[in-house]
A protein has these predicted regions:
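Elongated alpha-helical scaffolds
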Residues: 114-135, 448-451, 458
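Short linear interaction motifs
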Residues: 61-63, 101-117, 362-384, 430-439, ...
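Beta-sheet repeat architectures centered on beta-propellers
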Residues: 7-76, 502-830
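A short, polar beta-strand/turn micro-motif
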Residues: 137-150, 463-482, 709-727
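N-terminal beta-propeller domains
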Residues: 1-96, 285-385, 389-437, 498-518, ...
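Beta-propeller and closely related beta-pinwheel folds
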Residues: 53-59, 361-391, 396-546, 550-608, ...
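WD40 beta-propeller blade core
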Residues: 88, 457-458, 626
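Long, charge-dense tracts
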Residues: 125, 131, 145-154, 180-377
């Protein structure tokens, strides 16, 4: 059974597939280079790579640099190159901006900056962490402990004995200063002893005190504790050499202070007041009740206030500020905090057209000690990455996520240890039975998604807000992750890469509303060999629904800018791997992979802004700034796009005597350079006369110049298809002899279609745009037309290849196709 059949290809929107031809969609091809899949325009040429500026005219940059973008706001967009020992910054017009390295230059030392340097932007700061550096604690410590004691007299009681006994290791015996309070029977003489300040003064000075009334029945003496022998009655703790030779004594109202000489800590001090030390007590190093601190003290005194027995985490330190005021402070001989030279540094936008790279003064520990206000867990470890989330700077180290204090991007320590505040720093580990090192993060579904090599974690909270007591890191999925490529977010999706044999897989990660779980679909499942293994960057442009993957070639031996006289060459480094997608009311109706090739160029990195992609590119023997407009707009003057790489607009000078126009190429001599009249759109051959100077015949003062590039679409093998529950299914039984294929095109210039039968010569069909008798066929302007080109094939469906090619500067829009052939099948399908 047989007959003539025809089948429509409604569009070419879904790029390429590396599946077998029978598994491909009807609107997928086998190869697509330098073409764009657009929902409105169909299959068209990719946008040109516009030349903006030469970033460095004398140096090329190795692929080991760390490319970074700074996007402060619409008016502050910058490209940055970090390399071994230095950093350079350019605006998006290609102007290099001055960078002062004020301090910390050694932090930029790296044999592989692309791998070692991890960055995050926060306002005018770009924080940079060097993965090769181990973070250390500051060796500078707080003030050393003062070996001191206080005697605090708080109440007075008649008839009681107030006694203080001190013993220093260098003393031969303990010395006791005792005051026998008067009975209170003679108020005229006894009332002076009611003041606690007077009691302290008498213990300090003996009967020489102005407050000792000898007419009372009070008694004072300074005695040896071992024998009870009286040493003095006129001298006390602060005036007798028996004590002052070993202690530096001072007094305040109601308070006596003693400091052990030479810092010797092996001394004792005992008090007795006849009332169980409720009227007078000593304080040495610590106290359990904050309210018992003396009202007066020295401003260099620090006392630990202890919490519950056995709970060292409830201890805190206070320092005397002024009368009656003790303020929480850091303990004695405690590391002040972090070693700034090993911590992340910053590139700072000075908002005057200049930048400064410098070491950061990270906030010191101001309270507690190494237990109650411990170092963040990244100390003595290497930093894996940086992030910013909910007004906190974050650090990933080992399996921990560490956040600064809320809105305080330089502080990793609590400001009080007496309570846990919601704004305090956060330090949590990823949950799970295995230790999973955290490498990266991305904002996702109103939360933060973190990546280890084998799992994903979501930052959550057991309360309404994320705080030190409520934050949790729960595993939400278990996909392998390539930590060489930073994940990106796009709307409600996140994209991340995986290593797959010698290639790269990319997953589209999403929250499944039906199952309330997270999942990740492999969007490269049909193009498993497309993206090479050395992928290093994903670029997301949500304005134009485009994802771009960049890959490098073998790592350069250079780690800083260098001079070369040899033009750069590349294998993968000049290629952009393009994923075009489109959602219609929540349903994905387009998923198209292709590649854009920038010949003889090495792309170092890119950034997305609005509908544009900006690339830092080594081309020739220097480094350039390239701009791609993903909208692929038509030129408003000539009515169509001009498709040239390194495209730029130049002004020519016309000489009527020679009938030549002269112009200067901003990027020097280029093989294959052509000129396009920006008024009529015609192309002209140019002649290089000297240096960067070119000429062309005629008067053409407004010009586009650039290098033509070739666009190629290889059509998939065609099959007769029938509808099933899975869509159109290819029928492989029978013989399908294709007679011709008709392509419908819109507003296109020159292109050609090549048919190459197996074992036979290639035949060509040309669309030159000229259709006799139509309004679009005019002399002196490029031929642009719409219509249908019918290509004869006369081959079995599996015995030929069909390529659509164009190297013209003119546009090409292929809308759809119609395949006509003869199909014969000996059997009938049931």
């Amino acid at each position: 059974m047989g007959g003539v059949v025809s089948q429509s290809i409604p569009n070419f929107l879904n790029g390429i597939s590396q599946q077998t031809p029978t598994q491909r969609g009807i609107n997928q091809g086998e190869e697509q280079i330098n073409l764009q899949n657009n929902i409105v325009d169909g299959l068209s040429k990719r946008p040109p790579f516009d030349y903006l500026a030469t970033l460095d005219n004398t140096n090329v940059y190795p692929n080991t640099i760390k490319f970074w973008s700074i996007q402060r706001d619409k008016d502050n967009q910058y490209m940055v190159a970090f390399y071994n020992g230095g950093v350079k910054v350019w605006d998006l017009n290609g102007n290099q901006l001055p960078v002062t390295i004020a301090s910390g230059s050694s932090y930029l030392t790296s044999t592989n900056p692309k791998s070692d340097f991890k960055l995050v932007n926060i306002a005018d700061y770009t924080f940079i962490a060097n993965k090769s550096k181990t973070v250390l604690a500051d060796t500078t410590t707080s003030a050393a402990k003062i070996e001191e004691f206080y005697i605090n007299v708080v109440t007075s009681n008649y008839g009681r004995e107030y006694a203080v006994t001190v013993q220093h290791p260098n003393m031969s015996y303990a010395v006791k200063s005792s005051l026998q309070m008067p009975s209170g029977s003679n108020l005229n003489h006894d009332a002076v002893f009611r003041d606690t300040a007077h009691i302290a003064d008498i213990l300090f000075r003996g009967t020489s005190s102005a407050y000792f009334d000898a007419s009372s029945d009070a008694d004072f003496k300074l005695t040896r504790e071992d024998t009870g022998a009286t040493l003095s009655t006129t001298q006390g703790l602060g005036t007798s050499s028996e004590v002052t030779n070993y202690f530096t004594m001072s007094q305040y109202p109601g308070v006596i202070r003693g400091i052990s000489t030479n810092g010797n800590s092996n001394y004792t001090v005992l008090t007795a007041d006849g009332s169980g030390n409720t009227g007078m007590y000593s304080i040495r190093d610590e106290i359990s009740d904050f309210t018992k601190l003396p009202y007066h003290a020295s401003t260099d005194s620090i006392i630990k206030v202890t919490g519950e027995d056995g709970d060292t985490l409830s201890d805190y330190y206070v320092k005397f500020e002024t009368d009656g005021v003790w303020k929480e402070t850091i303990g004695q001989s405690v590391s002040l905090g972090l070693n700034n030279s090993t911590m992340p540094h910053a590139l700072i936008n000075n908002n005057d057209g200049t930048f400064t790279f410098q070491e950061i003064n990270w906030t010191d520990r101001t309270c507690g000690d190494g237990i109650t206000n411990s170092n963040p867990s990244f100390v003595n470890n290497k930093i894996n990455n940086l992030l910013f989330y909910k007004n906190r700077l974050g650090i990933l180290a080992r399996d921990n996520l560490i956040f600064t204090e809320n809105a305080e991007f330089f502080n990793f320590f609590s400001k009080t240890v007496t309570q846990v505040l919601d704004t305090d720093p956060i330090d949590i580990a990823a949950s799970g039975s295995e230790v999973n090192t955290l490498f990266d993060s991305v904002a996702f579904n109103e939360s933060l998604l973190l990546f280890s090599e084998k799992a994903q974690y979501k930052l959550g909270s057991v309360g309404e807000t994320i705080s030190p007591t409520s934050a949790v890191l729960n595993e939400v999925s278990a996909f392998e992750y390539n930590n060489n490529v930073k994940p990106v977010s796009a709307g409600k999706f996140a994209y991340f890469s995986q290593a797959r044999n010698n290639n790269t897989a990319i997953r589209e990660y999403f929250a499944d509303d039906d199952t309330l779980t997270n999942d990740g679909l492999d969007i490269t499942v049909s193009v498993q060999d497309l993206i090479p293994s050395n992928t290093y960057q994903l670029i997301s442009n949500t304005t134009e629904d485009t994802l771009i993957a960049l890959a490098s070639d073998t790592a350069d031996t250079q780690i800083a800018p260098y001079t070369t006289g040899t033009n750069v060459t590349s294998v993968n480094a000049g290629t952009l791997f393009i994923y075009k997608y489109f959602f219609d009311r929540g349903e994905k109706v387009q998923t198209a992979w292709s590649k854009w090739v920038f010949n003889n160029a090495k792309i170092l990195g890119g950034m997305s802004f609005e509908s544009f992609i900006y690339l830092m590119v080594v081309e020739g023997t220097n480094t350039k700034l390239i701009k791609i407009d993903l909208r692929n707009l038509k030129d408003t003057t000539i009515g169509f796009g001009v498709y040239l790489d390194l495209k730029t607009n130049v002004t020519g000078t016309y000489n009527s005597g020679t009938n030549l126009t002269t112009f200067t190429s901003p990027y020097g001599v280029k093989t294959g350079l052509i000129a396009i009249d920006a008024v009529n759109g015609n192309n002209y051959a140019v002649t290089n006369t000297s240096g960067s100077t070119y000429t062309l015949e005629g008067d053409h003062t407004n010009l586009y110049i650039g290098i033509p590039y070739e666009s190629i679409y290889r059509m998939s093998q065609q099959y007769v298809r029938e509808r099933s529950g899975r869509g159109l299914v290819a029928i492989t039984s029978g013989r399908y002899q294709i007679r011709n294929i008709s392509f419908n095109y819109e507003t296109s210039g020159y292109f050609q279609i090549e048919i190459t039968p197996n074992g036979r010569n290639t035949s060509y069909s040309f669309m030159n745009g000229y259709v006799i008798g139509t309004a679009t066929s005019k002399v002196g302007v490029p031929a642009i037309s719409s219509g249908t080109i019918k290509v004869p094939v006369s081959c079995r469906n599996t015995d030929f290849t069909l390529d659509i090619k164009s190297s013209s500067h003119l546009p090409m829009y292929i809308a759809s196709a119609e395949v006509e052939g003869y199909y014969h099948n000996r059997s009938t399908r049931i």
